[in-house]
Amino acid sequence: MVITMNKKLIQKRRMMKYFIEATQQIIEKESFDSVTVRKVSNLAGFNSATIYNYFKNLNELIYFSCIKYLEDYSKDLIICLKDSKNIFEYYMNIWKCFCCHSYKNPKIYFHLFFTNHTLCKGSIKEYFEIFCDDIDEPSRKLLPMLLSENIYDRNLSSLRNFVENKIINEKNLNDLNEMIIFIYQSMLYNILNDSVDYSIDMATEKTLKYINQAILSYKL
């Protein structure tokens, strides 16, 4: 019975991988908005109805496919963090790497973190379980942070280091967290809608500047 269930799980993950990779190809070769059930099923080599055996709807499939970009981010993050001299540099380097990746793909990241995905809860964790063979060892150490689907929780977890080191008062933590997310979300939204004419480097630099000012305003 256990063997049968394992085989079913392996088969399920294999099929999901076919559809996820097909969706990723469409996003990269065409665009985010070009993804349709028909295109994905044709590219994967199955009929359209098969998709619904593994995904609730097209939105869930697209969400899974967007998570690939977090994998790329996690690999670069290891490099960005290695020269951090203190917790402040460590925190700012997390944001620097995150901004660089998300501002290159604003629609992907906005979809991942600022769109209502109630039905997709747990998708990030399931994605990394499906593609566990593709994750290198250094990236595995960052999985607890990466697996959090709520960007407020992700950032709050990182900010707690400032409280533990008596840099920020505990009572101000939630306000600071909210302020930083608003800064990032605003820049991401403006880039997504072509409301600003910033290069990725300039947008990242401005975001880091505002985050730094926010932290200093709450510093003990």
Identify the function of each model-found stretch.
Residues M1-L43:
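Basic, helix-initiating cap at the start of DNA-binding domains
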Residues V2, E149-N165, N169, L173-L220:
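C-terminal peripheral helix-coil segments that are non-catalytic and often amphipathic
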Residues A44-F55:
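Short hydrophobic/aromatic patch on the recognition helix
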Residues I79-H111:
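Hydrophobic alpha-helical connector segments
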